[in-house]
Swiss-Prot record:
GO cellular component: blood microparticle; haptoglobin-hemoglobin complex; hemoglobin complex
Name of the encoding gene: HBA
Family: Belongs to the globin family.
Function: Involved in oxygen transport from the lung to the various peripheral tissues.
Further remark: Displays a pronounced Bohr effect despite the lack of the His at position 146 conserved in the beta subunit in most other vertebrates. Shows chloride-dependent sensitivity to organophosphates like ATP and 2,3-diphosphoglycerate (DPG) but not to inositol hexaphosphate (IHP). Binds molecular CO(2), not bicarbonate as reported for other crocodilians.
Organism: Paleosuchus palpebrosus
Tissue: Red blood cells.
Highest taxon of the lineage: Eukaryota
Complexes and interactors: Heterotetramer of two alpha chains and two beta chains. When oxygenated in vitro, exists virtually only in polymeric form. When deoxygenated, forms tetramers, octamers and larger polymers.
The protein's name in its UniProt record: Hemoglobin subunit alpha
Record: residues binding heme b: H87
PANTHER family to which the protein is assigned, alphabetical: HEMOGLOBIN FAMILY MEMBER (PTHR11442), HEMOGLOBIN SUBUNIT ALPHA (PTHR11442:SF48)
Domain Globin: start-end pairs: 1-141
Record's keyword annotation contains Ubl conjugation: no
């Protein structure tokens, strides 16, 4: 459960990303595919080269969804219900991949905002991403 301090920390660090959703999203996916190459199997039709239009487009979608989750931090289930259905029933993404993606999101924030990603903010952002992952995998059962 996210505390009020966690919510404040997440909103604060996220405000630094809201103007860079496509860039941060693309960088997150590129890191995901490089560090965890097994995740590429979900994107066989994508051009996975650096800065490709498909990676930028999907990265932006991922970060727009996270942006929406931040804006609805008190109702993550409602905000992410459609995406939960999509990933569980249509895409059938292995739930472990959400944790891998979350790790890459944390790295991107650390790279771009090292001073803002204090240990407390890091912990809050990690808790938030875990909460998002829990919602996205809730319909797998």
């Amino acid at each position: 459960v996210l505390s009020e301090a966690d919510k404040s920390n997440v909103k604060g660090i996220w405000s630094k990303a809201c103007c860079h959703l496509e860039d941060y999203g693309a960088e997150t996916l590129e890191r995901l595919f490089f560090v965890y190459p097994q995740t590429k199997i979900y994107f066989p039709h994508f051009d996975l080269t650096h800065n490709s239009a498909q990676i930028r487009g999907h990265g932006k979608k991922v970060f727009l969804a996270l942006h929406d989750a931040v804006n609805h931090i008190d109702d993550l289930s409602g905000a992410l219900s459609r995406l939960s259905d999509l990933h569980a029933h249509n895409l059938r993404v292995d739930p472990v991949n959400f944790k891998l993606l979350s790790q890459c999101v944390l790295v991107v924030f650390g790279v771009h905002h090292p001073g803002a990603l204090t240990p407390e903010v890091h912990a809050s952002l990690d808790k938030f991403l875990c909460a998002v992952s829990t919602v996205l995998t809730s319909k797998y059962r």
